[in-house]
């Protein structure tokens, strides 16, 4: 579908990102702020831009990302997943390359719940033999 706006929803851990892209100069805004301001760490910015770098569309699209929930790492992963889906919505021929890189698959790893009688999900009380 080639229209004015292409969109995609990405998820990672407890973060959800709604991504909207259109032809432009390469400006990326996250929750109304520039991506450099929103994500403090350079690795988070790099993770979010990976699909664009892979498909050589870094300077091609203006992207608006609305993301909520989770922390910085989860939000960057959700943004990457959403950008991937929006790129596929824009041009379906990009899907094999993005799939080969592993960006299309949703990372299903979630935090394991804390169990009763344990300190955390798996950490038990120290065992004393005597």
Curated annotation (Swiss-Prot):
Q: What is this protein called?
A: Small ribosomal subunit protein uS9
Q: What is the lineage of its organism?
A: Bacteria, Pseudomonadati, Pseudomonadota, Betaproteobacteria, Burkholderiales
Give the record's GO biological process terms. Answer: translation
Q: Which GO terms describe its molecular function?
A: RNA binding; structural constituent of ribosome
InterPro entries referenced in this protein's UniProt entry, alphabetically: Ribosomal_Su5_D2-typ_SF, Ribosomal_uS9, Ribosomal_uS9_bac/plastid, Ribosomal_uS9_CS, Ribsml_uS5_D2-typ_fold_subgr
Q: Please list the coiled coil stretches.
A: none
Secreted as UniProt keyword: no
The answer to whether keyword Transcription regulation applies is no
Annotated family: Belongs to the universal ribosomal protein uS9 family.
A Pfam family per the record: Ribosomal_S9
List the GO terms this entry assigns under cellular component, sorted alphabetically.
cytosolic small ribosomal subunit
Q: Which UniProt keywords apply?
A: Ribonucleoprotein, Ribosomal protein
